[in-house]
């Protein structure tokens, strides 16, 4: 029986698809008058590529073709070009690029992840995606691809330990709500997904990171302020971050900031601040400056906490924690000189 060819005459093989896509992206880059035809060819090629990678309702993706396409994407540099030219591609095409990128990133051969290896060797791909937050028309697409990259520890490590990581502090404050929220989702993912890696990163870069982080906690933007406070609570209560928590709660300026945030005009900010404040009070190993601040404000704190968010009548845990803190503060004694 005659073996069916992998690609029929009407279906181009991966090398042809990649070549057509590269050639037409080059036309789009020039921004001359012939872009309509090129744009159409780009759309068709992306569709064909997606069909090879994802299959269709009728058939599974052909393994051999997927391997060929992946190899072509790496060797031709097209994976990089697709990110670089994302702004030139139409709306549906941008969605296709995201799907193709994430699909090829998940691809494994045994225990190997070839695309993770490729991006590790070409880390500028990660920084192009990160810089995408500065371009509103591609920001959310870049965010989706970036979070897919972060699932892989080697790629998360490259971003965390790069100078560009600090750009997140700027992106989460962007004036466009959707983009700022997306940037925060990526930022949070980076700081919570790979626990041991993150603990190591925070310990090595404590001063720099927390200096930037403090600005988020004092942001004029309510959403940024609330999300940052909530994430801070998660970070210092994670057992992997014990050393970071110990350092954070030893510093009097951090306690003062939380005491101010307990009095914020927003009840939600107050509530998130409470969850960080309680760590200072509940710690059995308070530093002397922390004890002194709590003693200096002892009567005021007891009175304040007694009536703090009394409307939360259905939250038993909150009531228990509040009573525990009141007792801890009441029992504080001046140490003999």
Swiss-Prot record:
Q: Which InterPro entries match?
A: ARM-like, ARM-type_fold, Mo25
Q: Name one GO cellular component term.
A: cytosol
Q: Name one GO molecular function term.
A: protein serine/threonine kinase activator activity
One record GO biological process: intracellular signal transduction
The domain of life is Eukaryota
Which Gene3D superfamilies does its entry note?
Leucine-rich Repeat Variant (1.25.10.10)
Pfam families of this UniProt entry?
Mo25
Q: What does this protein do?
A: Component of a complex that binds and activates STK11/LKB1. In the complex, required to stabilize the interaction between CAB39/MO25 (CAB39/MO25alpha or CAB39L/MO25beta) and STK11/LKB1.
Q: How does it assemble?
A: Component of a trimeric complex composed of STK11/LKB1, STRAD (STRADA or STRADB) and CAB39/MO25 (CAB39/MO25alpha or CAB39L/MO25beta): the complex tethers STK11/LKB1 in the cytoplasm and stimulates its catalytic activity.
Q: What else is known?
A: Found in serum of 50% of patients with acute monocytic leukemia.
Q: Which PANTHER family did the record assign? A: CALCIUM-BINDING PROTEIN 39-LIKE, CALCIUM-BINDING PROTEIN 39-RELATED
Q: Which family does it belong to?
A: Belongs to the Mo25 family.
What is the protein name for this chain?
A: Calcium-binding protein 39-like
Q: Give the species.
A: Homo sapiens (Human)
Its gene?
A: CAB39L
């Amino acid at each position: 029986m005659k073996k069916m060819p992998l690609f029929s005459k009407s279906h181009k093989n991966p090398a042809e698809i990649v070549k057509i896509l590269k050639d037409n992206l080059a036309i789009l880059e020039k921004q001359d008058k012939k872009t309509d035809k090129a744009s159409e060819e780009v759309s068709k090629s992306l569709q064909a590529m997606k069909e090879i990678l994802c299959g269709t309702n009728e058939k599974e993706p052909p393994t051999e073709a997927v391997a060929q396409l992946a190899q072509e994407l790496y060797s031709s540099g097209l994976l990089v070009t697709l990110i670089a030219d994302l702004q030139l591609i139409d709306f549906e095409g941008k969605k296709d690029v995201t799907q193709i990128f994430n699909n090829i990133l998940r691809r494994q051969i045994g225990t190997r992840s070839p695309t993770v290896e490729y991006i590790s060797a070409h880390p500028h791909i990660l920084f192009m995606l990160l810089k995408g937050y500065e371009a509103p028309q591609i920001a959310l697409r870049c965010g989706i691809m970036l979070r897919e990259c972060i699932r892989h520890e080697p790629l998360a490590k490259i971003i965390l330990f790069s100078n560009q990581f600090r750009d997140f502090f700027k992106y989460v404050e962007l004036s466009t709500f959707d983009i700022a929220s997306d940037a925060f989702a990526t930022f949070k993912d980076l700081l919570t997904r790979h626990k041991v890696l993150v603990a190591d990163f925070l310990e090595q870069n404590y001063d720099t990171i927390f200096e930037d982080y403090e600005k988020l906690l004092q942001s004029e933007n309510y959403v940024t302020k609330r999300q940052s406070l909530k994430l801070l609570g998660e970070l210092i209560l994670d057992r992997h971050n014990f050393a970071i928590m110990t350092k954070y709660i030893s510093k009097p300026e951090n306690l003062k900031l939380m005491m101010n945030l307990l009095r914020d005009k927003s009840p939600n900010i107050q509530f998130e601040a409470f969850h960080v404040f309680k760590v200072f009070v509940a710690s059995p190993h308070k530093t002397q400056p922390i004890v002194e601040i709590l003693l200096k404000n002892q009567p005021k704190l007891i009175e304040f906490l007694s009536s703090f968010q009394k409307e939360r009548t259905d939250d038993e845990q909150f009531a228990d924690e509040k009573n525990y803190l009141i007792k801890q503060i009441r029992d504080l004694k001046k140490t003999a000189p």
